[in-house]
């Protein structure tokens, strides 16, 4: 079960820059060799050190003395490096005297739930949880997400853990590996988690045993960890699930990228709905913290449309509440939430943790918020401990469907589609990622971040001279501009030397009007923001 490398193996690897493994509030790295230019940096020994560091961090957070024995849950998605990293993480924790609950194949939301569940038979609650996943990234990548009963860890926590891991790693190189003293217990936690989802739907339908009976729902798990939703959630609720696809875990992801934002993935679930004449289609990402849906006509319920749908459900339950979203949501969504639903739209930054933390902050100031969502498919609700849970979000849709069917047994997914009726949607949506050449003379030895900020300031100057363009008066990220029947947002990536440019227009003909603004030159880039818009017309 434990990794078998000795101290000499550690010494042969040399120095490891642990901080380079940080990806915001997650850890990401290359775990499998074979891709040119991508050397392995998430080895079993590195994983052991990170796991031991998390245990030390957790012990400190709980203000427990060194004699306290922690219980940490460990789960993984379908990646081909999952088992070796699970064993390494297990050894890292048990070698420092703490116990491990091994869940095996699991979803990210389930790992957080395990810190809340009161179930002595299944050894819960856990003091903390580790999910081994790299979301929708290629097969050679992997990583970790960490949880306590307070939710997912933040960037500062991750930095602390990686600094601890670096010291532990160096110490193990000098002293060799420690013997395992903690206890490992295998737990079927996904059955507990799925049972909670089933009970939530039954409750919404007046405790009817099979509230989805007669409905045909297909699921696309993308060969990730979401296949459980068919046998453990939908079938017990009475749904027909024939035509569901890619439910078997396969870390090579042979059919499509398990990502609700991916065009091929959405086409796959749409085709499954149409081919099987299903009432509803559901698609998950690899670790089930994101999701999207498709109605019976093949209409995609994702991005702005899914946020509109969830907003309608939540605002019906909590009138006037604030909906927090990421920065690239549409102007039409703002109008829909505020004018049609009577809520408040608070557009914030990209990054699911940023959006969730902002909703939590608003509540702490007295501004009620019950929903935080990203266009990527991350969605978190106050009622669900602010966990971004793709399965729970789909359960909210099923609750609405099941509740409506108690009044009209023949009703289908149109009841969901109708909730987003009136949302003004873009004819053209484009994202172009503009890379900053860090060797360009214009940088003059400075950082890409300083250079990117100077481009944003220059853009503001350009916008102020055009009466047809209007900068958003309140914006938390980048420069957002409306005009010519659409809007665009230019922002600086959180981690990479990239300026993502998002553009939306209501009518495709107006896209070309917007693209004709190429006269506005950017001194810094020698290109124009609007010529990128023009380039986008060729891509779209």
Regions found by a protein language model. Give the residues of each.
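Eukaryotic N-terminal low-complexity, Ser/Thr- and Lys/Arg-rich leader segments
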Residues: 1-20, 35-38, 65-66, 172, ...
